[in-house]
C-alpha cells in the first residue's frame, strides 16, 4: 500500500567529519546528529558515503596500508550489531527517517553500503554500491543483488539512495528512477574544488563535477536530491596519512546541498571546512510541476523502443543446481 505523500517534508543533510577509524565514537556522533536534526523539525536526515567509520582516504595515496586496512575492517559496521541497533533506536526515539552510508563488514569482507531506516527504527533496506570505484577496489567488494534495493516507501513518501559514482551509471540510475522515488540521497566522501586545466585529477570527481551530477539526477528523475558530503580536518589528514596524496590532502571537502526536482538549489552552503547540518522544507507538489513537462518513466518515454533488463538472481557461494536454474531469470522493466 502506498503511503500518502505529505505536501511538505523537512529534510536535514549532514556535512560532518566522522571520528576516523572509530566505530563506537562515530555511531555516538551519528546519534547526536540525528537528535540535533530532529530538534530542528527534520523528518529525514542523510549521511555521507562510508560515514561509518569514515571514508578510507589513504587508498588514493597508496594502494596498500596493512595497518589502516586492518583497523578499518575492525571498525566497519555490521548490520546485525549493537551499533546498528543503537542507530535504529535513535531514529525511533527522534521520529526521524535515517539514510546512512557506512562500510559494511560481512565476515570481515567490506562493502560500501547504505541503509534506509524508518522513523520507527526499522531497517527498510540495505544496499551495496554496485561497483567500488577505482582504488576503492583495494578495500571493498562488489555488490550483491541487493544493490538494486535502493528505493523504499516511508512516512514521507518514496525515498531512494545511491552512492558516489553510481550517479554516472545510466542503467542503475534508470532502474532507481523506475522505482518512483520522491526524495533521493546522493552520498559522497569529502569533495574538493577542481584545480583547473593543469589539474590532473578528473573534474567529475571534484566538488563542482559531483554537484553537476546531483542536479542532473534531480532533473532526470524529477525528485529532490540530498547531496550529502563529509568533511576532513587536518587531524583527519594526519590520521589517513594523505598529506602527499592527490586528493583529501588538506582540510575541507564539505559541499552538501539540496536540489529541487527541476535542479534548482534549495539550500544555503556551509564552508567546505565547516561541520553542520543544512535544512530545507521540500514542497512535494513541485514534483507535479516537473512531471507535467517530463516523466522519463511515463509520458516522456518509449518503452516500445528502449527498455531495461534486470538480472534478478543472487549469486551465492553455495547453491544447489536446481535452485540455480530456478532463480536464473531476467526481469524486464
Swiss-Prot record:
Presence of keyword Cytoplasm: no
Family that this chain belongs to: Belongs to the carbon-nitrogen hydrolase superfamily. Nitrilase family.
Protein name: Arylacetonitrilase
Single annotated GO MF: arylacetonitrilase activity
High-level lineage: Eukaryota, Fungi, Dikarya, Ascomycota, Pezizomycotina
Cysteines engaged in disulfide bonds, as pairs: none
Major enzyme class: hydrolase
EC numbers for this chain: 3.5.5.1, 3.5.5.5
Active site (UniProt): 49, 129, 164
Function: Nitrilase that hydrolyzes preferentially phenylacetonitrile, (R,S)-mandelonitrile, and 3-indolylacetonitrile.
Species, as recorded: Aspergillus oryzae (strain ATCC 42149 / RIB 40)
SUPFAM superfamilies in the cross-refs: Carbon-nitrogen hydrolase (SSF56317)
UniProt catalytic activity: a nitrile + 2 H2O = a carboxylate + NH4(+); 4-chlorophenylacetonitrile + 2 H2O = 4-chlorophenylacetate + NH4(+)
Ranges where the CN hydrolase domain occurs: 9-284
Transport listed as a keyword: no
Alphabetical UniProt keywords: Hydrolase
Amino acid at each position: 500500500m502506498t503511503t500518502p505523500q505529505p505536501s511538505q517534508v523537512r529534510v536535514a543533510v549532514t556535512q560532518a567529519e566522522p571520528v576516523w577509524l572509530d566505530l563506537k565514537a562515530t555511531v555516538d556522533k551519528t546519534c547526536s546528529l540525528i537528535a540535533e536534526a530532529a530538534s530542528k523539525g527534520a523528518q529525514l536526515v542523510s549521511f555521507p558515503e562510508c560515514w561509518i567509520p569514515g571514508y578510507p582516504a589513504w587508498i588514493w595515496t597508496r594502494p596498500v596500508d596493512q595497518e589502516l586496512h586492518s583497523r578499518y575492517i575492525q571498525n566497519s559496521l555490521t548490520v546485525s550489531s549493537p551499533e546498528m541497533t543503537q542507530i535504529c533506536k535513535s531514529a525511533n526515539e527522534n521520529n526521524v527517517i535515517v539514510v546512512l552510508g557506512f562500510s559494511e563488514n560481512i565476515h570481515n569482507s567490506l562493502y560500501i553500503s547504505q541503509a534506509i531506516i524508518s522513523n520507527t527504527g526499522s531497517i527498510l533496506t540495505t544496499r551495496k554500491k554496485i561497483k567500488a570505484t577505482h582504488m576503492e577496489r583495494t578495500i571493498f567488494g562488489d555488490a550483491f543483488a541487493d544493490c538494486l534495493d535502493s528505493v523504499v516507501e516511508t512516512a514521507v513518501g518514496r525515498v531512494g539512495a545511491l552512492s558516489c559514482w553510481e550517479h554516472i551509471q545510466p542503467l542503475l540510475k534508470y532502474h532507481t528512477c523506475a522505482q518512483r522515488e520522491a526524495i533521493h540521497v546522493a552520498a559522497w566522501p569529502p569533495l574538493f574544488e577542481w584545480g583547473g586545466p593543469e589539474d590532473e585529477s578528473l573534474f567529475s570527481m571534484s566538488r563542482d563535477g559531483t554537484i553537476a551530477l546531483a542536479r542532473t539526477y534531480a532533473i532526470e528523475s524529477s525528485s529532490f536530491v540530498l547531496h550529502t558530503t563529509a568533511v576532513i580536518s587536518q587531524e583527519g589528514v594526519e590520521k589517513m596519512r594523505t598529506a602527499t596524496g592527490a586528493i583529501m590532502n588538506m582540510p575541507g571537502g564539505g559541499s552538501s546541498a539540496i536540489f529541487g526536482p527541476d535542479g534548482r538549489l534549495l539550500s544555503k552552503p556551509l564552508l567546505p571546512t565547516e561541520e553542520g547540518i543544512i535544512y530545507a522544507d521540500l514542497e512535494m507538489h513541485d514534483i507535479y510541476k516537473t512531471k507535467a513537462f517530463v516523466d522519463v518513466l511515463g509520458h516522456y518515454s518509449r518503452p516500445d523502443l528502449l527498455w531495461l533488463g534486470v538480472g534478478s538472481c543472487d549469486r551465492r557461494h553455495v547453491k544447489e543446481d536446481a535452485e540455480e536454474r530456478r532463480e536464473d531469470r531476467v526481469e524486464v522493466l
